[in-house]
Amino acid sequence: METEIGDRGVEDGRADECADDECTENGHAPLRRCIVTRERAAPETMLRFVVSPDRVLTPDLAARLPGRGIWLSARRDVLETARTRGAFARAARGQVTIPPDLDRILEAGLVRRMMETVGLARRAGQVTYGFAKVREWIAGGRAGLIIQAEDGSPDERTRLLSGARDLPVAVVPTAAALGAAFGRDHVVHAAMSHGELARRFRVDNERFAGLSGRTVPGLADRSAGLG
């Protein structure tokens, strides 16, 4: 359930009071606090930013860059609020330069990460593509995640998914982007087996979906989200 963004959360926005490795809940993995909503969540589901030496806000989608992190929920409305109401500057304790195309940079970065994961799965034999092969994996119980290109045929998508009602579905923007991960001009349908790579893909896909605000008719209840 999404938290409503209120004035107090924005006014109080600052870098998490906890050090990057100290903010925990009930002894579990570290959590991070969104500078806008003030909600805490697992870091892999959020967006991390750092401020470069020349005070430029820099996305850190892998959460590996040095420096104190600024954390944001991966939602389009939260990003817009942070940009327009000074939350980034407050969290950074000073003025920062925000790239004008920050949303595009984030979306492109997440798509790139998803396609890199597909590439890893391909080399490990954990992913296949094409209508017939995906249906074969579904029928054989090998598919753990279905990947669909948003610009594919809705009718073909419906036929494919009719046999995969219990499987999560992740949507990527274009068949060209998905195809590139397989060394093809375009790929509309793919399936990934259960495992860490599928989980990693789903995490990035959930972040991408939250930022892009895209919805595909008929797939509203088939999200690959991890919740």
What would you call each of these model-derived segments?
Residues 1-85, 90:
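N-terminal cysteine/histidine-rich coordination modules
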Residues 30, 69, 84, 110, ...:
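Helical mechanochemical/support elements of P-loop NTPase systems and associated helical scaffolds
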Residues 41, 77-79, 151-154, 176-177, ...:
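Conserved nucleotide-binding/hydrolysis micro-motifs of P-loop NTPases
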Residues 68-69, 124-125, 142-145, 164-168, ...:
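Short active-site oxyanion
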Residues 76-151:
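Extended interfacial segments that mediate partner engagement and assembly in macromolecular machines
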Residues 122, 131-132, 155-171:
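Positively charged, polar, low-complexity stretches
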Residues 165-209:
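Short basic, glycine-rich beta-strand/loop surfaces that mediate nucleic-acid
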Residues 203-227:
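Charged phosphate-binding loop/patch that engages nucleotide di/tri-phosphates or the phosphate backbone
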